[in-house]
Amino acid sequence: MYKRQQKQRVALAGVLALSPDILVFDEATAMLDPDGRQEVLRTICRLHTQQHKTVVMITHYIEEAIGADRVYLIHDGKMIADGTAREMLTQPELLAAAGLTPPMPVQMYYDLKQAGIVLARCPLTLEELAEELCRSQ
């Protein structure tokens, strides 16, 4: 008998075998452990960048939206905002209106700002946060 993660991978492989031009993933990583989530996200990214597939991803994991070309925030079935990942994910008040919390690097940016440490730009990833912290010294 397959475990949940294995079932999800088999389902993904079955869809990919059809080679559609547009892929819609609804909570594609919901039942996966962190390593499994990263593996699926890398696969989805490769499908978009290398095979030029259009990917629509529906997720409650805000970190999964960081690499998106476009982000649509939906709350109670209504779109409340749209824009680039940076435009959408660096506004804690907007995320709160959608019932979401900011990615950890964004929250750290605002916590540092409140403590008097101002960085040049709001980071989306840990790598960007590290770069901004190194630049600010």
Task: Label each PLM-derived region with a short phrase.
Residues 82-83:
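ABC ATPase "signature
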Residues 34-36:
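Helix N-cap at the start of a conserved alpha-helix in ABC-type nucleotide-binding domains
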Residues 95-137:
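ABC ATPase nucleotide-binding domains
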Residues 23-26:
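Catalytic Walker B motif of ABC-type/P-loop ATPase nucleotide-binding domains
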Residues 19:
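Conserved catalytic motifs of ABC-family nucleotide-binding domains
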Residues 12:
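Hydrophobic anchor residue at the start of the ABC signature
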